[in-house]
């Protein structure tokens, strides 16, 4: 399965939670696409498989629509590691460079962060890295390259981000367009509720 490049609002409607796109459009029509209005007095019962698939899709799209093969590789690595599989899976996703760029406030969405990384706007420890899936480690310095610092896009994104939303495993130096990875993320707060245990069960079916 390739990466979905269509409207994320439609994906949000299908999953029933906002994973991207237009929040206003989702709030106005938060029922699955293809339905002409809401189904009144009747709730579609999902199979056990469909429920678990839906949780996996939520997490995939929350992190910008990661390809299925790549997402499965993350899961396999987490499953092989010692410790809580679900927690390790989230840690691997959080340590992606595009996610860190988003978490620091350089981008408004993870999709935007992926594009900005690909276009070579960021340095990691002084070297340009244009691979969105690049995995950061504690001590890594992520900074905006000099040529990009006058861009209104980055200034606007940083100004609009509430400093309190930056997780405690990251540190932002807004004046110097620089962030630092302090530690491996432990308490990970997702923007939407995701039952990671159901994702583990999905890959065990």
Swiss-Prot record:
The Swiss-Prot or TrEMBL record annotates one GO molecular function as: rRNA binding
Q: Which residues form the S4 RNA-binding domain?
A: 95-163
Q: What does the record note on quaternary structure?
A: Part of the 30S ribosomal subunit. Contacts protein S5. The interaction surface between S4 and S5 is involved in control of translational fidelity.
The positions making up the signal sequence are none
**Keywords (A to Z) from UniProt:** Ribonucleoprotein, Ribosomal protein, RNA-binding, rRNA-binding
Name of the gene encoding the protein in the UniProt record: rpsD
Q: Which organism is it from?
A: Persephonella marina (strain DSM 14350 / EX-H1)
Keyword Ribosomal protein part of the UniProt annotation: yes
State what this protein does: One of the primary rRNA binding proteins, it binds directly to 16S rRNA where it nucleates assembly of the body of the 30S subunit. With S5 and S12 plays an important role in translational accuracy.
Kindly give the SUPFAM superfamilies that the UniProt entry links to this protein: Alpha-L RNA-binding motif
Protein family according to the UniProt entry: Belongs to the universal ribosomal protein uS4 family.
The uppermost taxa in this organism's lineage are: Bacteria, Pseudomonadati, Aquificota, Aquificia, Aquificales
A cellular component annotation (GO) from this entry: small ribosomal subunit
State the name under which the record lists this protein: Small ribosomal subunit protein uS4
Tell me the Gene Ontology biological-process terms attached to this UniProt entry: ribosomal small subunit biogenesis; translation
Which Pfam family is an annotated match for this chain, by its short name?
A: Ribosomal_S4
